[in-house]
Amino acid sequence: MRRRTMVVSVLLAVSAAGLSYAGCVNKQEQKGVDIGASQSVKDLMVARGLTDADVEAALKTYVPPGKHDEYMIFASGGQSGNLHVMGVPSMRQLKTIAVFSPESWQGYGVGGDSDKILAEGSQDGHKLTWADVHHPNLSETNGDYDGEFIFANDKANARVAVVDLKDFATKQIVANPLVASDHGGAFVTPNTDYVIETSQYPAPLGRTYAPLSEFKEKYRGVAVFWKFDRKRGRIDKAKSWAMELPPYTQDLADAGKLDSDGWT
């Protein structure tokens, strides 16, 4: 069965909404005439001071009960530590996926297997119950989104999570033992063989301390290639590896596609 299209970027939805709104504003603002509305709808328009453009904009986002949105947005929850799923065009919030932070209302992090998942993401022996989620990314097949998994990174604590989209549930959190923070998102290679996590700020490797006077000698960046086992739906830490980089500040890091396949 063909999966419904999934969209990761909030900006895409916002841009589309902006274009629709701009088109509506340019139309002549008449009340209850051009859209062929029933008398009851016309009465509502008059009572509420709505224009045809207002009603048209509302209809563009309306999805009746029992019908599905055409697209989904997977938005980072920032310092909530979780992911938010919204439908497009309705913009309804369909789901909050608990990832790095406990969510008692959905039973995440308050007992059972979810406690073990959160414990997996401990850093330096400390159990973490907060995060700063940035740039979630969908799994890919031949460089195209396949909607099977989504990966999220914790910018504040250098961790990556695996979410299975069969049930929209977090299955694994891995902690990066090399770096203090990341900002490379959790981008994947074209067939999701690896999830790429890069450090944001240069720091001594191994999450240790060194004075700035030793910056050139001890401060470094890192790109980690987490090996993903698609059959198990888990990152295989034993088959993962890292590349040491110079001590510069890094931002997003994705894998190449088509002519740039094999580069990152």
Where in this protein do the model-derived segments appear?
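Bacterial N-terminal signal peptides that target proteins for export
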Residues: M1-V10
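Bacterial N-terminal signal peptides
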Residues: S9-G18
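Bacterial signal peptide processing site
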Residues: Y21, V25-Q28
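A short beta-strand motif characteristic of beta-propeller blades
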Residues: G49-A53, R92-T96, G125-W130, A169-N176, ...
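Repeated scaffold domains used in trafficking and secretory/extracellular systems
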Residues: E56-Y62, E103-G111, L128-N142, L178-P190, ...
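Short, conserved, GDST-rich strand-edge loop motifs in beta-rich repeat architectures
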Residues: K60-E70, H135-L138, G147, E197-R220
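Short coil/turn segments that connect the beta-strands within blades of beta-propeller domains
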Residues: D69-Y71, G147-E148, N191-D193, D261-W263
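Beta-propeller domains
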Residues: S76-G121, A152-P177, F228-D236
